[in-house]
Amino acid sequence: MQFTLEPFMNSFLPAGANRVDAILTVTAVGAGVMADKPQAVVGLILDISGSMQGQRMEAAKHATRKAIELIDPSAQFFVIAFSNHVWRVAAPAPATPQNKALAQAAVQRLEAGGGTVISQAMHQARTEFQQLPGALHYALFLTDGKNDTADEDYLTQELAACEGVFQCDCRGVGTDWQTKQLQKIATKLLGTAQIIAEPSSMEADFRAAIQNAMGRAVGNVRLRLWTPKSAKILSCKQMSPEIVELTNRAKPVDAQSFDYPTGAWGAESRDYHVAFQLMTGEIGDEMLACRAAIVYQNAGQEVKISAPPLVATWTEDETLTSRINAQVAHYTGQEELAAAIQQGLEAREKGDMDSATRFLGRAAKLATESGNDETTRRLSKVVDIVDANQGTVRLKSAVNKADEMDLDLGSSRTARAARKPNLDA
């Protein structure tokens, strides 16, 4: 696996300005040569509470058995089931045909019943993963209901303990679960949160998730930002393929360097938005804002891939200072789009239809302007888009709950910015 790190920014500041915004594009290509490619460990975590009875339970068992088939023979795997208790359905074991068959048989015997206590399932998953250190730890979590209210504080504590131990993709089947609960887990554990509206779609979703996990080759990759004493980091966010707030997850390396977690990587590309505050310079001054690098371990040695330094220059030339970097502008718009959707859905839930129409109209306009067709498609199931260019929409009188939840969860997914070859484009 080979990484590249490319910065995009307008490096020219007018007199008195002290903020620099940069987009850092990180790309990993090819399998590359990894001296000790880590083993993968896959955990499947299934909700078997009473609400899963019937079609959902049968679809979940079928999808899980199919997912087990897809796990690479070089990996290890385990299966956990939970309701208001937790069960080790299949202990961690190599993904041999025999072990897969035993696990599939155990999954088929599962029966639904009881409540929903997610913290116990996360604790058990963490325990299993910690038995196999140094591996790529991935979990696929499925639920169909709301977590027990009494468990929320325990879940928050457990997720803090799970952070950095494993990544987790979350799936909600049906519409009786809460999007914010799934997002809470996925965000903390660097995963995705998606709805499976119909049980019949579960197998295809599980298949895609497992195939994606099996394509990862490098784990615990960090974005390292070094700043001089004349600069400080204001924020750091992943912007593509979806928005993930990383600012408060920085780990100090030394007095001037911080690592931001990015998880495991396959062949892919992601964009990060970093904002800096500098000591204000004089016209003609140049100041280093940051040295950025991607850092990971290979054969016990730290590998570091550095970007060109991010340097700011103060100038009186308005043709230079008035430029808005295309990458920065694009992702600023994508962040505004996500916020508009959230504000619109919240207003709609409160019965403030005028505000909901205004916010979702703004979202339709931003989605169209940025070419975010996926978000436009989701919006069109909640509003009638009368004139996207003007942001004119009408709220639909009847909205499928699954479509509303899909728009909520999908609001953080962004359209990729067009690539530009230099810092000042």
Annotate each predicted stretch with a short phrase.
Residues 4-220, 279-282:
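Exposed acidic/Ser/Thr-rich ligand/metal-binding surfaces
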